[in-house]
């Protein structure tokens, strides 16, 4: 492909609304163009990378036995009402009516459609296991679309759905998809982690997220330095330690004037924050309340607490609600001397503490020398804190956890019978008895993965594509191509020989200064580059360079061609 016959509208300046690197570089390199908030056109260069990733996904889905179909983007409301998600999903679901006043939505996901297909078409145990997948454009009306393809409203997604006769068979299907996802991201050349995660609004019994590691990642994840354990920080498990010794101090009320935060109280009393207990009052928004206790230097994990209590929602109580239960404004809360009955849930770390500081439920007052059991009672001991760096691994002995930033690019769920039960998707077993189908669902953000690759692979000059996702494998840059026929002929020959070997090549034949060409090629990030110039060519050489920090080498054209072919075959050799 000649540069002059392709279309790459690069920008010199970064658009003002582009906040993260991937958004900036995708706009500047001419990969995408914004049409509306969170809605983008994939320009020719960007579409090539999108298609590359889609092909890898298709190959691995097919290898895992999944079957491709294509479901409609527009979905009827009655299916969502049947699954009970029409009311639950909120304003992110774009709803509209047709001319006959029938209600529809633009699909942000396809559990309802695929479950409807299954209950119509999958009638016997003989038809399972079966796994369907699609690559489809979806729409989710994000309240604040940002970061380009990272959090758009319209997006391309691969979603797959497995159907099995029972939980054990569903586990096998889940494992197949889990392994397929690992192969997909390995083939893309990405540094990633598969982490345990919460099931969120999709529901189900278990899930894993696939996270591309990047300093700009919105999600915090933890992984063990000694074993394969990894989890989203919201899901990461705490380890229950052995209980410490009994407290020795007497419970003493102390005056703490205007000291409302843990840091202020600890400093005032000359204690480490780990010697204090933080009390928080929370609500489910439906009249139920709880007081959560965590060590002063720890943070409450609201998701863990919500799941522990079986609540659908969780939120901080209002000042008036706090006053009703404690008689105190926020800043001086504690579990001792509550004014109304309130369930108290303490984190594992609190039960190991002795002689600690708590709020006295009075303005400017705290207690020192507090101890659980002796001074106040706890309703439940549970793992309810956020886990951090240095915490012990919950899976192995001796390992400690490290914290990373990650970008979620894939998610796999064990749905169980959540959708099949509500939508009556059943089959007949070997004995002719009707049974509920077990399901799994598996998603990959196509555009998001391409953007995450840029977040992980770039420098101050532009994108540094991993070869499998690059729009072109190699660029051949002809210097003074319009004036030097020998240079252009040699560049064309290299281009043709590489293409014949299956290498995707962009031949830069523009009438531009060398510096302009080099800057553009650094920006768009093509991994391999051969530069053909008159002086070097006269000596039988061309320049060969790798975008990822490689030094420029002078090689004979034949050697340069062989180097490119070898690197492409090594990185893009197909399904493994």
From Swiss-Prot:
Organism: Trichlorobacter lovleyi (strain ATCC BAA-1151 / DSM 17278 / SZ)
Catalytic activity: tRNA(Pro) + L-proline + ATP = L-prolyl-tRNA(Pro) + AMP + diphosphate
Subunit structure: Homodimer.
EC number: 6.1.1.15
Keywords: Aminoacyl-tRNA synthetase, ATP-binding, Cytoplasm, Ligase, Nucleotide-binding, Protein biosynthesis
InterPro entries recorded: aa-tRNA-synt_IIb, aa-tRNA-synth_II, aa-tRNA-synth_II/BPL/LPL, Anticodon-bd, Anticodon-bd_dom_sf, Pro-tRNA-ligase_IIa, Pro-tRNA-synth_IIa_bac-type, Pro-tRNA-Synthase_IIa_type1
Protein name in UniProt: Proline--tRNA ligase
Gene that produces this protein: proS
SUPFAM superfamilies documented for this protein: Class II aaRS ABD-related, Class II aaRS and biotin synthetases, YbaK/ProRS associated domain
């Amino acid at each position: 492909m000649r540069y002059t016959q392709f279309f790459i509208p690069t920008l010199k300046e970064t658009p003002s609304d582009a906040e993260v690197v991937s958004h900036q570089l995708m706009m500047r390199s001419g990969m995408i163009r914004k049409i509306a908030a969170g809605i983008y056109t994939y320009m020719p260069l960007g579409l090539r990378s999108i298609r590359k990733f889609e092909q890898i996904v298709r190959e691995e889905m097919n290898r895992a036995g999944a079957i491709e179909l294509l479901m409609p983007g527009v979905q009827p409301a009655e299916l969502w009402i049947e699954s009970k998600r029409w009311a639950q999903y909120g304003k992110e679901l774009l709803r509209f009516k047709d001319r006959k006043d029938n209600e529809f939505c633009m699909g942000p996901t396809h559990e309802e459609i695929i479950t409807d297909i299954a209950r119509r078409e999958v009638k016997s145990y003989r038809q399972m296991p079966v796994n369907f997948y699609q690559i489809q454009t979806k729409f989710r009306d994000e309240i604040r679309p940002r970061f380009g393809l990272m959090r758009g409203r319209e997006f391309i997604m691969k979603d797959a759905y497995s159907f099995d006769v029972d939980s054990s068979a569903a586990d096998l299907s889940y494992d197949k998809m889990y392994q397929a996802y690992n192969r997909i991201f390995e083939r893309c050349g990405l540094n990633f982690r598969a982490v345990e995660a919460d099931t969120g609004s999709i529901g189900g019994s278990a899930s894993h997220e696939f996270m591309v590691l990047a300093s700009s990642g919105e999600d915090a994840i933890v992984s063990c330095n000694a074993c394969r354990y990894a989890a989203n920080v919201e899901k990461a498990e705490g380890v229950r330690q052995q209980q410490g010794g009994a407290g020795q101090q007497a419970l003493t009320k102390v005056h703490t004037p205007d000291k409302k935060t843990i840091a202020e109280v600890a400093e005032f009393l000359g204690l480490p924050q780990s010697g204090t207990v933080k009390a928080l009052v929370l609500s489910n928004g439906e009249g139920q309340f709880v007081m959560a206790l965590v060590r002063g230097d720890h943070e409450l994990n609201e998701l863990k607490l919500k799941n522990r209590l079986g609540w659908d929602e969780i939120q901080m109580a209002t000042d008036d609600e706090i006053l009703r239960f404690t008689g105190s404004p926020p800043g001086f809360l504690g579990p001792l001397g509550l004014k109304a009955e309130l369930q108290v849930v303490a984190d594992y770390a609190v039960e190991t503490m002795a002689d600690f500081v708590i709020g006295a439920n009075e303005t400017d007052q705290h207690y020192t020398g507090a101890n659980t059991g002796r001074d106040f009672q706890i309703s439940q001991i549970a793992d309810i804190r956020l886990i951090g760096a240095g915490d012990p691994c919950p899976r192995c002995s001796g390992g400690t956890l490290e914290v990373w930033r990650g970008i979620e690019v894939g998610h796999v769920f064990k749905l169980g019978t959540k959708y099949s039960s509500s939508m009556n998707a059943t089959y007949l077993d070997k004995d002719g008895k009707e049974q509920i189908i077990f399901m799994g669902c598996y998603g990959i953000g196509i555009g998001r993965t391409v953007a995450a690759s840029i977040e992980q692979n770039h420098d101050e000059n532009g994108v540094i594509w991993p070869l499998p996702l690059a729009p072109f494998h190699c660029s051949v840059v002809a210097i003074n191509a319009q004036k030097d026929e020998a240079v252009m002929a040699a560049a064309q020959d290299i281009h043709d020989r590489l293409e014949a070997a299956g290498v995707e090549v962009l031949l830069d034949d523009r009438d531009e200064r060398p510096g302009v060409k080099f800057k553009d090629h650094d920006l768009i990030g093509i991994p391999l580059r051969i530069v053909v110039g008159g002086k070097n060519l006269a000596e039988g050489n061309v320049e060969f360079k790798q975008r990822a920090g490689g030094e420029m080498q002078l090689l004979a054209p034949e050697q340069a061609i062989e180097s490119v072919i070898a690197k492409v075959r090594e990185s893009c050799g197909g399904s493994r």
